[in-house]
Structures are given as C-alpha cells and as structure tokens.
C-alpha cells in the first residue's frame, strides 16, 4: 500500500506535466508559425505589391500579433491599390477587409468608424452575417434597439440557427 501511493501520485504528476508540456509546445508552434507568416508577408510587401488575398492574409496576421495599426494600414493599402474591387470574385474578401477594419475600430472604441466599415462590408455583400451581427451590436451599444432588432431579423432570415442573433435578439427584448 505504501509503495503504490507514491507511484499513483507520480503517475498523476507525470500525466499533468505531459499535458502541460504538450499545451505549451502547441502555443510555441502557433507563435513561431505566426512569426514566420508575418516575416514572409513583410518581405513580400517590401519586394512587390501584395495582391488582394495576400493583403487580407497579412492584415489577419497583423491582428493576430496585435499590430492593429499595421493591420489598418495594410487593409487600406489593399483597398486603395486594387482596381478589381468591383469584381464579384473579390467581393467576399473586400467585405471581410471592411469587417476587419470595423472590428479593429470597435476594439479601439471608435464605434462611429466601426459602424461605417461594417456598413461598407454590407454594401459589398448584403448577406455577410458577421458584418450584420457586428453592425447590430453597434446599434445595441448606441441604444438604437429598433435597428439592431431589424438587423438580427435579417440575419435570422439568412441563417435561422445563428446563435449570436438569437441570443442578442432575446436579450434586447
């Protein structure tokens, strides 16, 4: 009995340490991957202009690294440089870029700017659920409940099982 108790505790400790080391190694892997992607896009942007997909990907990497200013700059560069913004195949990316800019400004507590970018995303893609939910949240924050409810209704018409719209709609009633 006395011998099995320390073995049991050591086994539990070993399992805990193995799990903990696995989690840390996954985090390190994510950090190194993010850093290599950032460096790749940084080098590529120095050598030539980034296309719309690369610019969007670079902006996402900048957000993940909490380089919000750089993400804003890169997003605006992509939107400004690209003359193919009106093509339908780029509409989804452009809507995501506008939504991403809205998200950055929302996190910086610049709700008016965020609202403008969410509206632009919806202009590009009227059924973009994420931007619709984000704009509705802005209206909630500014106590414009009727507009928020209308946007949540639109989301629920597109996707009836949308958890965000269902939850917020119940909350604002």
From Swiss-Prot:
Subcellular location: Plastid, Chloroplast
TPR repeat placement: 52-89, 95-128, 129-162
GO cellular component: chloroplast
InterPro entries attached to this UniProt entry: TPR-like_helical_dom_sf, TPR_rpt
Matching SUPFAM superfamilies: TPR-like (SSF48452)
Pfam family, one: TPR_8
Source superkingdom: Eukaryota
Major location (coarse): plastid
Alphabetical keyword list: Chloroplast, Plastid, Repeat, TPR repeat
Family statement: Belongs to the ycf37 family.
Protein name: Uncharacterized protein ycf37
Species, as recorded: Porphyra purpurea
């Amino acid at each position: 009995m006395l011998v099995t108790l320390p073995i049991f505790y050591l086994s539990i400790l070993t399992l805990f340490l193995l799990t903990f080391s696995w989690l840390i190694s996954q985090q390190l892997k994510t950090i190194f991957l993010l850093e290599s992607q950032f460096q790749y896009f940084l080098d590529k942007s120095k050598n030539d202009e980034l296309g719309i997909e690369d610019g969007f990907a670079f902006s996402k990497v900048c957000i993940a690294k909490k380089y919000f200013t750089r993400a804003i700059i890169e997003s605006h560069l992509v939107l400004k440089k690209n003359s193919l913004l009106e093509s339908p195949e780029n509409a989804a990316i452009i809507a995501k870029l506008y939504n991403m800019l809205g998200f950055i400004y929302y996190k910086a507590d610049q709700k008016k700017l965020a609202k403008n970018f969410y509206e632009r995303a919806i202009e590009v893609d009227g059924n973009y659920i994420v931007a619709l939910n984000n704009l509705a949240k802005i209206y909630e924050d500014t106590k414009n409940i009727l507009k928020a409810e209308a946007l949540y209704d639109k989301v629920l018409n597109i996707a009836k099982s949308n958890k965000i719209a269902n939850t917020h709609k119940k909350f604002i009633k």
